[in-house]
A protein has these predicted regions:
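Membrane-water interface signatures at transmembrane helix termini and the short loops
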Residues: 121-132, 266-271, 278-335
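Perimembrane helix-loop-helix junctions
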Residues: 171-199
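Aromatic- and kink-enriched transmembrane "portal" helix at the membrane-lumen/periplasm boundary
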Residues: 60, 110-138
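Transmembrane-helix motifs of polytopic, lipid-linked glycan transferases
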Residues: 84-107, 142, 282-283
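Transmembrane-helix signature of polytopic, membrane-embedded enzymes
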Residues: 97-119, 293
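Short hydrophobic/aromatic helix or loop-helix immediately within or flanking a transmembrane segment
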Residues: 53-87
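Membrane-interface alpha helices of multi-pass inner-membrane proteins
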Residues: 151-176, 307
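Membrane-interface transmembrane helices that cradle and orient dolichyl/undecaprenyl
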Residues: 139-152, 184, 338
Length: 379
């Protein structure tokens, strides 16, 4: 009888995450029904740019690996290659989460639903295309859930920063999970297991800051990218990626800060309040069984830290989703250790799944799928 119950709960867990993958991939393939068509995927440069073309520069690792392995040229149309790569990435990310839930016997129905169908995690990644966020999440998930060795931990931190510098904003969550919730690791400032990850992270940041700038003109850069992206050429204002890999942090800070302040003044910031409320609920869920003030402080800090990306980049819902994702991943880590899957917050978190996915850019589109349906059939 007990074995039958366990078998059924495992099957249910499997079906929940398979459904999440299918739902996310359906959103990924929105090009079939939207007026934008394949352009709904957004930018492709980050999957096709390579060190072999321009030398070392920031945000070039993923594109280099995909270019050298020729995975990004599996299809003659680069948009289909991008869709394929993104679908595989969704599958990998979801499989890692599902495996962790299965291994740690996390099978509370409402809790798992709140994870699998969160508007910020698996489903959101079906909509959040044209960037490197999903690769950042995969590295973060591996470090938070599975890594116990500080050498491997450090290596993944280094790789993550090379993927995209916004990975830096997930570091507090990863350090929290590694040192405070792995029994084999204790945070000792002068211990080699602490010093090496910190030095590795700082080294990657320094390398990006001082050696990650392009040494090529915009015209030469775009000539190369035009050959790589014939179908995406001039289809997006930022189609080539030159702006993203060449602009300074100071310029990004100035533009992004002004952008957010403008939308606070015009009232559009109100659209972001419900997604921010969701993050608040996740914080309450994550901290509910923690009685250590120190751990609560660091946990809340780790969850909220990704919101600071808004000061250097404009895509407000991406950063809210990243913050929510750190909350979800750390909650899973905490629950796996404590065994407390039940919570009064589970039902509210599950209800929020009805809003999936969150948007990416633009204050006025917090729930793009719902808004698309309303605009398509009712307005």
């Amino acid at each position: 009888m007990i074995n039958a119950v366990r078998k059924n709960s495992s099957l249910l867990l499997f079906l929940i995450f398979i459904s999440a993958i299918l739902y996310s991939c359906a959103i990924l393939n929105r090009w079939i029904v939207t007026d934008l068509g394949l352009l709904s995927y957004n930018r492709l440069w980050q999957l096709n740019i390579s060190y072999t073309d321009f030398g070392f520069f920031r945000r070039g690792l993923v594109g280099t690996l995909l270019s050298e392995s020729r995975i990004n040229s599996l299809f003659s149309n680069e948009y289909f290659s991008a869709l394929f790569i993104h679908a595989i990435s969704i599958f990998i990310m979801t499989s890692l989460i599902a495996y962790y839930c299965f291994r740690k016997n996390i099978k509370n129905f409402l809790f798992v639903i709140g994870i699998a169908f969160s508007p910020a995690l698996i489903i959101h990644q079906g909509y959040n295309t044209g960037n490197l966020d999903i690769f950042i999440l995969i590295i973060s998930i591996i470090n938070i859930f599975f890594v116990r060795n500080y050498i491997i931990f450090s290596l993944l931190l280094f790789i993550g920063v090379l993927i995209h510098e916004i990975f830096i904003f997930t570091l507090p969550a990863q350090f929290f999970a590694f040192y405070l919730y792995n029994r084999s690791n204790k945070l000792k400032i002068l211990d080699v297991a602490t010093i090496i990850p910190v030095i590795t992270s700082l080294s990657a940041i320094v390398i990006i800051l001082f050696f990650g700038k392009l040494d090529i003109s915009e015209l030469e850069f775009k000539d190369v990218m035009q050959n790589k992206l014939p179908n995406a050429y001039m289809k997006h204002i930022l189609w080539s990626g030159f702006y993203e890999v060449s602009t300074s942090g100071q310029l990004n800070l100035s533009l992004s800060t002004q952008y957010h302040f403008d939308h606070i003044k015009d009232g559009r910031f109100i659209y972001a309040l419900l997604p921010l409320f969701y993050v608040g609920i996740l914080i309450l869920r994550a901290t509910q069984n923690n009685h250590s003030r120190r751990e609560v402080f660091f946990l809340v800090f780790a969850i909220l830290f990704p919101l600071l990306i808004a000061f250097v980049a404009m895509d407000i819902y991406r950063w809210i989703a990243m913050s929510a994702n750190m909350a979800l991943l750390l909650t899973l880590k905490i629950v796996a250790k404590s065994g407390h899957t039940y919570s009064k917050w589970n039902i509210l978190i599950a209800i929020f799944c009805l809003l999936a996915p969150f948007g990416a850019a633009g204050y006025a589109r917090p729930f793009p799928m719902h808004q698309f349906v309303l605009e398509k059939f009712f307005f």
